[in-house]
Design a protein with these regions (language model features):
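C-terminal beta-sandwich/jelly-roll accessory domains of carbohydrate-active enzymes
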Residues: 101, 108-145
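Active-site core of glycosidic bond-cleaving carbohydrate-active enzymes
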Residues: 1-101, 131-138
Length: 145
């Protein structure tokens, strides 16, 4: 249980893998703003160039960090869907294994995303399909509705 106490974020024991999805459950039920606040706090307070919350656990803490910065997370691994959050960088370019490019653009004011689009089409759901991202394109987070 020492792993759960290593990072004090209340019931969200981010240093323990069974809790890594908890901030994104807010987004899954439609409250992206609350998810964004938790994720940003964890990124800011739990990570730096020398520290992970808890131990690295064969890449799981690094993977959580990367998803937190990208703005989406696999709440239900294997489902083929990522729950949307908020991108925590201004612009990201990901070169996919297929050679396709995924551009992620953050146009939010830093609080939350009220609108997300993929290749110019608004995303009405609170998730995006893995297959869609793997084809490449532009995922854009906006503050305005």
């Amino acid at each position: 249980m020492t792993e759960m106490a290593a990072a004090d974020f209340g019931q969200c024991a981010i240093s323990n893998q069974p809790s890594m999805h908890l901030p994104y459950l807010y987004s899954a039920i439609g409250n992206i703003g609350k998810a964004a606040r938790y994720v940003r706090r964890i990124l800011r307070e739990g990570y730096n160039e020398n520290v992970f919350p808890g131990d690295e656990d064969n890449g799981s803490m690094s993977a959580w960090y990367i998803f937190g910065v990208l703005g989406f997370y696999p709440v239900c691994p294997g489902s083929g869907k990522y729950v949307l959050g908020v991108c925590n960088a201004r612009n990201i370019t990901v070169k996919l294994g297929s050679g396709n490019i995924l551009n992620i653009i953050n146009e939010t004011d830093g609080s939350s995303a009220f609108r997300v689009s993929f290749n110019g089409a608004n995303i009405k759901e609170n998730f995006i399909a893995h297959d869609k991202l793997m084809r490449g394109g532009t995922l854009r987070f906006y503050t305005e509705v």
